[in-house]
Amino acid sequence: MSYTIQAQTRTEIGKGSSRRLRHAGKVPAVIYGQGKEPVSIVFDHKDIINIQANADFYTSTLTIVVDGKEVGVRAQAMQRHVFKPLIEHVDFVYA
């Protein structure tokens, strides 16, 4: 199955800006991989909460549209809130 997530590049990095994004219903994330520069991104929580429930989300290649440019990635790690159904951060690896 194919998944597409719309994202924007993050300009503010750090704990405070990440908390502000989470309170606004956004999820901070990073895309990294061998030989490529890491990219900090942000996307809406509602865009990922439903698709991550599918088992093939973790094994298939996802498409993230970052500022109009499509990037193929795989989910590497996901940090969740301790008791709320919230995703706090996602690490993606270039596919």
Swiss-Prot record:
Keyword Transferase: no
Origin: domain of life: Bacteria
GO molecular function, one term: 5S rRNA binding
Keywords: Ribonucleoprotein, Ribosomal protein, RNA-binding, rRNA-binding
Iron-sulfur keyword on record: no
Cellular component terms (Gene Ontology): cytosolic large ribosomal subunit
InterPro entries: Rbsml_bL25/Gln-tRNA_synth_N (IPR020056), Ribosomal_bL25/Gln-tRNA_synth (IPR011035), Ribosomal_bL25_long (IPR001021), Ribosomal_bL25_short (IPR020055), Ribosomal_L25_dom (IPR029751), Ribosomal_uL5_bac-type (IPR020930)
A family per Pfam: Ribosomal_L25p
One Gene Ontology term from the biological process aspect of the record: translation
HAMAP family: Ribosomal_bL25
Summary of the function given for this chain in its UniProt record: This is one of the proteins that binds to the 5S RNA in the ribosome where it forms part of the central protuberance.
Family note: Belongs to the bacterial ribosomal protein bL25 family.
PANTHER family documented for this protein: RIBOSOMAL PROTEIN L25/GLN-TRNA SYNTHETASE, ANTI-CODON-BINDING DOMAIN-CONTAINING PROTEIN (PTHR33284), RIBOSOMAL PROTEIN L25_GLN-TRNA SYNTHETASE, ANTI-CODON-BINDING DOMAIN-CONTAINING PROTEIN (PTHR33284:SF1)
Assembly description: Part of the 50S ribosomal subunit; part of the 5S rRNA/L5/L18/L25 subcomplex. Contacts the 5S rRNA. Binds to the 5S rRNA independently of L5 and L18.
Name of this protein: Large ribosomal subunit protein bL25
Species for this entry: Shewanella baltica (strain OS155 / ATCC BAA-1091)
Gene this protein is translated from: rplY
